[in-house]
Amino acid sequence: MKPENKLPVLDLISAEMKTVVNTLQPDLPSWPATGTIAEQRQYYTLERRFWNAGAPEMATRAYMVPTKYGQVETRLFCPQPDSPATLFYLHGGGFILGNLDTHDRIMRLLASYSQCTVIGIDYPLSPEARFPQAIEEIVAACCYFHQQAEDYQINMSRIGFAGDSAGAMLALASALWLRDKQIDCGKIVGVLLWYGLYGLRDSVTRRLLGGVWDGLTQQDLQMYEEAYLSNDADRESPYYCLFNNDLTREVPPCFIAGAEFDPLLDDSRLLYQTLAAHQQPCEFKLYPGTLHAFLHYSRMMKTADEALRDGAQFFTAQL
């Protein structure tokens, strides 16, 4: 798509989204576009500190979980001692960025609004770790907490997965992995998916949208994919292109959230239409005027807070 033919996204977004885009952090250096991936990860962590401020206080615990690849860091957010379920959260960041700190506020608000224990899993990033290592470590962490539930005083009888962007793909892929391989980690009662990618290679929204403002040009998306996957054949794996998995049976109830000006929006629409066509429990909600990654900005955006509340309400309705 010739850039001039794309939608003028920054003219079309909502007033509160524009406020976020125009919010400057004077002490923050420029984005290291030509820097190393380590420098970009460091910048991302610094940039998110402002947006994570003011999150609810609650009991938190950290555990290192053993996997066949080594140990993975996890963080538990416990809003109350008698949690009705446990929700595993997987952060976004194109598979190459992000950690438990960059998504701290999101996890705290989810825990507060759902009154469920939320466990963030700091899965290994790409390109150091290639598909399907992240999924395997997520599943290993779920199994570990299922086995240690009594010792850690968490309720693993009912669980869920949640994630944003790349984390949304990992959330649904992990749920399908557990189903397909018949691994019992507790009953999966819900999956919360904010503006994920689920396997489309091209779409209308991928053509019309995406730019320097969201880091989701076609070239960006190709770079994330190449960093994450081990080889070309992985593109068709049912745990990367989730539309190649069986979405006609035993898919946990899915809350699918879309951002209006997100190039990945058609992934969410197709996922919803596929699940709904096969009578799989699902709900789709579009958040007008928003860009990809808007969930981070609940400190300033009522719509972001609403999207988190909607996801939490969907999850608790399944209990």
Swiss-Prot record:
It holds the Pfam family Abhydrolase_3. PROSITE patterns: LIPASE_GDXG_HIS (PS01173), LIPASE_GDXG_SER (PS01174). A motif (Involved in the stabilization of the negatively charged intermediate by the formation of the oxyanion hole) lies at residues 91-93. It is found in: Cytoplasm. Its EC number is 3.1.1.-. Gene3D superfamilies: alpha/beta hydrolase. Keywords: Cytoplasm, Hydrolase, Serine esterase. One of its GO terms (cellular component) is cytoplasm. InterPro entries: AB_hydrolase_3 (IPR013094), AB_hydrolase_fold (IPR029058), Acetyl_esterase (IPR023508), GDXG_lipolytic_enzyme (IPR050300), Lipase_GDXG_HIS_AS (IPR002168), Lipase_GDXG_put_SER_AS (IPR033140). One of its GO terms (molecular function) is carboxylic ester hydrolase activity. The active site is at S165, D262, H292. Its main location: cytoplasm. Displays esterase activity towards short chain fatty esters (acyl chain length of up to 8 carbons). Able to hydrolyze triacetylglycerol (triacetin) and tributyrylglycerol (tributyrin), but not trioleylglycerol (triolein) or cholesterol oleate. Negatively regulates MalT activity by antagonizing maltotriose binding. Inhibits MelA galactosidase activity. Homodimer. Interacts with MalT and MelA. Belongs to the 'GDXG' lipolytic enzyme family. HAMAP family: Acetyl_esterase. This is Acetyl esterase. It comes from Shigella boydii serotype 4 (strain Sb227). The gene is aes.
